[in-house]
Amino acid sequence: MGAPPGYRPSAWVHLLHQLPRADFQLRPVPSGFAPRDQEYQQALLLVAALAGLGLGLSLIFIAVYLIRFCCCRPPEPPGAKSPPPGGGCVTWSCIAALLVGCAGIGIGFYGNSETSDGVSQLSSALQHANHTLSTIDDLVLETVERLGEAVRTELTTLEEVLSERVELVAATRGARRQAEAAAQHLQGLAFWQGVSLSPVQVAEDVTFVEEYRWLAYVLLLLLVLLVCLFTLLGLAKQSKWLVVVMTAMSLLVLVLSWGSMGLEAATAVGLSDFCSNPDTYVLNLTQEETGISSDILNYYFLCNQAVSNPFQQRLTLSQRALASIHSQLQGLEREASPQFPAAQKPLLSLEETLNVTERSFHQLVALLHCRSLHKDYGSALRGLCEDALEGLLFLMLFSLLSAGALATTLCSLPRAWALFPPSDDYDDTDDDDPFNPQESKRFVQWQSSI
């Protein structure tokens, strides 16, 4: 199938699409996008479950490390006041992990923004497509009503005025038949009229979900940022109660990070399957929801020379009918105006109606061409399969970095907490500790003595 203009599946789409998939029985599952298929749903759930496995391994590692730290720690010599050496190394490792987490937060904000931009582009494309479809329906309705009004009023009046000339009455009735035929042909061009599926409603639903997704990620990013900052503050002030609280919060955020990573991974894999061949799924789904013929849908979704315009015959017949009406009105104006002055007014009104109808017809021809709607289709795919997918990958990187940083922090904080001096004995803190308050006090005293 022909790709929409400007859209080509990216390298990330190909890479994620080629990853193996399996159901709960570990049987291979095809990578074609089939969200209603139970085996495909199980494959995506299994991808999300890998994050749960990562969370379990992280918790086991942290538990084993802390148990070893508590049970295998050598006893302190009697009367020892200074903490064991290496406190600075423990503190610096915790600081490094927190700085990595802060870098991941920046990546997360960028990914969240990219995903939001992609969804916004999808929503804008759907709204523009809805505007095009609504304009087609409105133009067809107005044109058909205008021709019907001309048949009921001007042509009827003209027949009454020209009743004395049989050949002129015949020409008038011929124009009536052509107007009715043109209206009938034009009425079949409103292919979206009466369809329950509304692109603007889909756009509103997508925007509604995206707003809550964006807000949820902003809150998660801010929560991770606050945990990192307050943990650094607790290390700087050597506040035991703050470190204990941040340890509990780090455990909570660790669970949230792995959970968000599972959702992101499953969504990215499913989105890559859709983006590798979107035409087939979108065409089948649209035909199922709207009941529109496959010829029309193929014309707009593919828009290439291999697919003919399904409206070409109706457009040709309508154009011929309008040209015939125009020719007959010109003949009536030449023959009837000198002999029947009363025919001048309906003829002028008919001529004006015909000119407006021809302008609307040419506008319809432009709107019915596949270029406009196919361009919207390509824009929607680029927003979803390029910006949104790229944003999801950055969010996955954020989740991975924050999970690793928080796991390291959870291993380091209890050791750092154990190295904190009692509140009444700050003079015995480790000289290697970068947050040693006595070192800061000595530095201030040295400056004042200069």
Swiss-Prot record:
<keyword id="KW-0868">Chloride</keyword>
<dbReference type="GO" id="GO:0007219">
    <property type="term" value="P:Notch signaling pathway"/>
</dbReference>
<feature type="topological domain" description="Cytoplasmic">
    <location>
        <begin position="236"/>
        <end position="240"/>
    </location>
</feature>
<dbReference type="GO" id="GO:0034707">
    <property type="term" value="C:chloride channel complex"/>
</dbReference>
<dbReference type="GO" id="GO:0000902">
    <property type="term" value="P:cell morphogenesis"/>
</dbReference>
<dbReference type="GO" id="GO:0005509">
    <property type="term" value="F:calcium ion binding"/>
</dbReference>
<comment type="subunit">
    <text>Homotetramer; disulfide-linked. Homodimer.</text>
</comment>
<feature type="topological domain" description="Cytoplasmic">
    <location>
        <begin position="412"/>
        <end position="450"/>
    </location>
</feature>
<feature type="modified residue" description="Phosphoserine">
    <location>
        <position position="440"/>
    </location>
</feature>
<dbReference type="GO" id="GO:0098609">
    <property type="term" value="P:cell-cell adhesion"/>
</dbReference>
<feature type="disulfide bond">
    <location>
        <begin position="275"/>
        <end position="385"/>
    </location>
</feature>
<dbReference type="GO" id="GO:0031589">
    <property type="term" value="P:cell-substrate adhesion"/>
</dbReference>
<keyword id="KW-1003">Cell membrane</keyword>
<keyword id="KW-1015">Disulfide bond</keyword>
<dbReference type="GO" id="GO:0031527">
    <property type="term" value="C:filopodium membrane"/>
</dbReference>
<dbReference type="GO" id="GO:0005886">
    <property type="term" value="C:plasma membrane"/>
</dbReference>
<feature type="transmembrane region" description="Helical; Name=4">
    <location>
        <begin position="241"/>
        <end position="261"/>
    </location>
</feature>
<keyword id="KW-0869">Chloride channel</keyword>
<dbReference type="GO" id="GO:0010467">
    <property type="term" value="P:gene expression"/>
</dbReference>
<feature type="transmembrane region" description="Helical; Name=1">
    <location>
        <begin position="44"/>
        <end position="64"/>
    </location>
</feature>
<keyword id="KW-1133">Transmembrane helix</keyword>
<feature type="glycosylation site" description="N-linked (GlcNAc...) asparagine">
    <location>
        <position position="284"/>
    </location>
</feature>
<feature type="site" description="Essential for the formation of the channel-pore">
    <location>
        <position position="165"/>
    </location>
</feature>
<dbReference type="GO" id="GO:0016020">
    <property type="term" value="C:membrane"/>
</dbReference>
<dbReference type="GO" id="GO:0046847">
    <property type="term" value="P:filopodium assembly"/>
</dbReference>
<comment type="function">
    <text>Calcium-independent, swelling-dependent volume-regulated anion channel (VRAC-swell) which plays a pivotal role in the process of regulatory volume decrease (RVD) in the brain through the efflux of anions like chloride and organic osmolytes like glutamate.</text>
</comment>
<dbReference type="GO" id="GO:0015813">
    <property type="term" value="P:L-glutamate transmembrane transport"/>
</dbReference>
<dbReference type="GO" id="GO:0005229">
    <property type="term" value="F:intracellularly calcium-gated chloride channel activity"/>
</dbReference>
<feature type="transmembrane region" description="Helical; Name=5">
    <location>
        <begin position="391"/>
        <end position="411"/>
    </location>
</feature>
<dbReference type="GO" id="GO:0022008">
    <property type="term" value="P:neurogenesis"/>
</dbReference>
<dbReference type="InterPro" id="IPR006990">
    <property type="entry name" value="Tweety"/>
</dbReference>
<feature type="disulfide bond">
    <location>
        <begin position="303"/>
        <end position="370"/>
    </location>
</feature>
<feature type="region of interest" description="Disordered">
    <location>
        <begin position="428"/>
        <end position="450"/>
    </location>
</feature>
<keyword id="KW-0813">Transport</keyword>
<feature type="topological domain" description="Cytoplasmic">
    <location>
        <begin position="65"/>
        <end position="88"/>
    </location>
</feature>
<feature type="transmembrane region" description="Helical; Name=3">
    <location>
        <begin position="215"/>
        <end position="235"/>
    </location>
</feature>
<comment type="similarity">
    <text>Belongs to the tweety family.</text>
</comment>
<feature type="topological domain" description="Extracellular">
    <location>
        <begin position="1"/>
        <end position="43"/>
    </location>
</feature>
<feature type="transmembrane region" description="Helical; Name=2">
    <location>
        <begin position="89"/>
        <end position="109"/>
    </location>
</feature>
<dbReference type="GO" id="GO:0048863">
    <property type="term" value="P:stem cell differentiation"/>
</dbReference>
<dbReference type="GO" id="GO:0072089">
    <property type="term" value="P:stem cell proliferation"/>
</dbReference>
<feature type="glycosylation site" description="N-linked (GlcNAc...) asparagine">
    <location>
        <position position="130"/>
    </location>
</feature>
